[in-house]
Amino acid sequence: SIGTGIGGALTVGGQLYHGAHGTAGELAHLLVPVSGAIGCGCGRTDHLEAVASGPAMAAEYAARAGVPTQPLQAVVALMHSGDPIARAVVADAGTLLGRVLAGVATAFDPEVIVIGGGAAQIGADLLSPLTSAFRVEAMGPIAETAILPARLGTDAPLVGAALLAAATRIEITP
């Protein structure tokens, strides 16, 4: 999920895989192949969320264009109107996402990678460079892993959380 942050989940045999510490699929704080120290909200640098989330793309546009930071939706509108800086920022974020996902796929060999969240709604301008970078970076047959947009769009994380709650029968007591 690409939005205000970066999130992920792994399923194995149709079941959500939590991992030994409950953090399986946490992609936000994977290191990214960038030059420079880009600060992350966690206090460290060069994490995926710091360079490819919606706020990161908006901040990068502001830095490159020399303008105040504006919402990602404004950057996307500029991209659609042909702004070369906006197009480059989105493409660069897609490329970094694709490279990191190639590493994740090399480790876990998934059948499919589903991309959702608000920033994923940018569409082909983000997903095309993501897919291209993934195909170049991934090894062997992993490079052919299907990369699909989430069918539920921006609702995917909410539906996933609700399904998790239902599956684990979380009870709320007053």
Predicted regions and their residues:
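ATP-binding/phosphotransfer module of carbohydrate and carboxylate kinases, centering on a glycine-rich
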Residues: 11, 34-40, 44-174
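Glycine-rich phosphate-binding loop of actin/hexokinase-like ATP-binding domains
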Residues: 1-51
